């Protein structure tokens, strides 16, 4: 927790924190509780990367009344143009069905390229790309 507090004190302008490759970590209430509490105290949201089906982050975030979102899918789990495009199409379907959908991706050049192409066509598909904080607040209220 000391490391988290130190890192959080060094940056400005971010809206929240997220787990990364912490599947075992996010399923343990006693481990996650102080992290969620510290983030909530600072007015931050939490993005669960969706890697752990038994993650306790959602319930802990709800208990703190903090903004929260869970990634619906990893867009570049298979980092090829075809698979990224397929994942983005699935993300669109989820967004149309539920009103919002959250995808995560790494900063691979192919991921950035495919997301940029996809984002340009969203309006013609009846979808609006919004900041993650919008999805977090929608999740918190709904």
What are the language-model segments listed below?
Residues 2-88, 100-101, 106-127, 133:
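Catalytic domains of cell-wall/extracellular-matrix polysaccharide-remodeling enzymes
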């Amino acid at each position: 927790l000391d490391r988290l507090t130190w890192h959080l004190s060094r940056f400005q302008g971010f809206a929240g924190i997220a787990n990364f490759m912490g599947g075992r970590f996010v399923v343990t209430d006693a481990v996650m509780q102080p992290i969620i509490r510290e983030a909530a105290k600072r007015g931050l949201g939490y993005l669960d990367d969706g890697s752990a089906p038994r993650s306790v982050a959602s319930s802990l975030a709800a208990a703190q009344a903090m903004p929260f979102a869970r990634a619906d899918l990893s867009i570049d789990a298979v980092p090829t143009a075809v698979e990224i495009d397929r994942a983005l199409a699935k993300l669109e379907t989820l967004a149309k069905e539920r009103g919002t959908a959250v995808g995560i991706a790494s900063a691979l050049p192919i991921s950035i390229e495919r997301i940029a192409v996809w984002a340009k066509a969203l309006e013609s598909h009846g979808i609006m790309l919004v900041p993650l904080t919008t999805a977090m607040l929608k999740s918190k209220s709904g």
